[in-house]
């Protein structure tokens, strides 16, 4: 494809390489380093004048460093006369801080949106935003892609009894997501209501729905410390589920998450590769990874060629 350049930040170079390979492109040359005072320095090592530039950087690892690196890369390309700069952010940072949940609390997701725009981003491509209204924080186009088509494909190919499964949301906020998946599989859905007094701490959970003698599939957009999904798995087994799977778009797995998964009753915990999982898989045999590079690559191709990306909301590209 002419007049297109793809650059990778340092947060997820493996995913960036897969995207570039699917597009038949080489990753652009970029040098990232830290000064002795820990300031980030980025040098774009090739011309981007008049080019359609895509910068792949996921909000993971050292998130603040990754975000700052992305902002500097966007700005470097913009002031080097790139015709358009698109930030490809598979896992959007600060997405959970999307509203004021108490007095004097910040709306950090809006701040990140402002920073990306001011840095010079013309377009954002992301996946399964924690809150879809974050798209409205931007004054530039935002394509929020969905992992759902790849999730449906994985379920059909890897769970033999999927026709006798039940899709479960671990909280009320995910009801729309699970009903969509359940409708397409033509199966039932259930809901777990949780009462949370403090962040990352769940006080009690109530199951709404019948999971007896069924394979239960927990579906959520992300898992961080995994307290919620592990408690939910125990609740589902005690309610009569034969097996329990968890399918998550963003596997953050911070703190004691991996040890919790290892001791929990999951058949498998399935995540996409919006966040690197290689190190975590070494310590947890239950983790399975769905590759979503083909969705991001096709979104880039369609954006570059001026085509609609809505096809990707319901189909897995070849």
UniProtKB/Swiss-Prot annotation:
Superkingdom classification of source: Eukaryota
Molecular function GO terms recorded: ATP binding; kinase activity; magnesium ion binding; protein homodimerization activity; ribose phosphate diphosphokinase activity
Residues in the signal sequence: none
This protein's UniProt keywords: ATP-binding, Kinase, Magnesium, Metal-binding, Nucleotide biosynthesis, Nucleotide-binding, Transferase
SUPFAM superfamilies registered for this protein in UniProt: PRTase-like
GO cellular component, one term: cytoplasm
Pathway the protein acts in: Metabolic intermediate biosynthesis; 5-phospho-alpha-D-ribose 1-diphosphate biosynthesis; 5-phospho-alpha-D-ribose 1-diphosphate from D-ribose 5-phosphate (route I): step 1/1
Residue sites binding ATP per the record: 96-101, 130
Cofactors demanded by this protein: Mg(2+)
Family per record: Belongs to the ribose-phosphate pyrophosphokinase family.
Protein known as: Ribose-phosphate pyrophosphokinase 3
UniProt lineage: Eukaryota, Metazoa, Chordata, Craniata, Vertebrata
């Amino acid at each position: 494809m002419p007049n297109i350049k793809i650059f990778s930040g340092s947060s997820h170079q493996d995913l960036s390489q897969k995207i570039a390979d699917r597009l038949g492109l080489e990753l652009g040359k970029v040098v990232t380093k830290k000064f002795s005072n820990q300031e980030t320095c980025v040098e774009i090592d090739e011309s981007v004048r008049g080019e359609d530039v895509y910068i792949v950087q996921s909000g993971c690892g050292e998130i603040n460093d990754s975000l700052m690196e992305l902002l500097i890369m966007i700005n470097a390309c913009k002031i080097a006369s790139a015709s358009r700069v698109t930030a490809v952010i598979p896992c959007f940072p600060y997405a959970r801080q999307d509203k004021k949940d108490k007095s004097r609390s910040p709306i950090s997701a809006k701040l990140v949106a402002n920073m990306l725009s001011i840095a010079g981003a013309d377009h954002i491509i992301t996946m399964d935003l924690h809150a879809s209204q974050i798209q409205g924080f931007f004054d530039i186009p935002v394509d929020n892609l969905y992992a759902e088509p790849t999730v449906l494909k994985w379920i059909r190919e890897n769970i033999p009894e999927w026709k006798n499964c039940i899709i479960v949301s671990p909280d009320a906020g995910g009801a729309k997501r699970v009903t969509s998946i359940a409708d397409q599989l033509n199966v039932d859905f259930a809901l777990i209501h949780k009462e949370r007094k403090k962040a990352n701490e769940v006080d009690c959970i109530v199951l709404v729905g019948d999971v007896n003698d069924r394979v239960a599939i927990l579906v959520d957009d992300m898992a961080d410390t995994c307290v919620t999904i592990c408690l939910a798995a125990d609740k589902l087994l005690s309610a009569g589920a034969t097996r329990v799977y968890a399918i998550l778009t963003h596997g953050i797995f911070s703190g004691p998450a991996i040890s919790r998964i290892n001791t929990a009753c999951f058949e498998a915990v399935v995540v996409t590769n919006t966040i690197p999982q290689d190190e975590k898989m070494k310590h947890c045999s239950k983790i399975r990874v769905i590759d979503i590079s083909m969705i991001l690559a096709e979104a880039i191709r369609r954006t570059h060629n001026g085509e609609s990306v809505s096809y990707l909301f319901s189909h897995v590209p070849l």
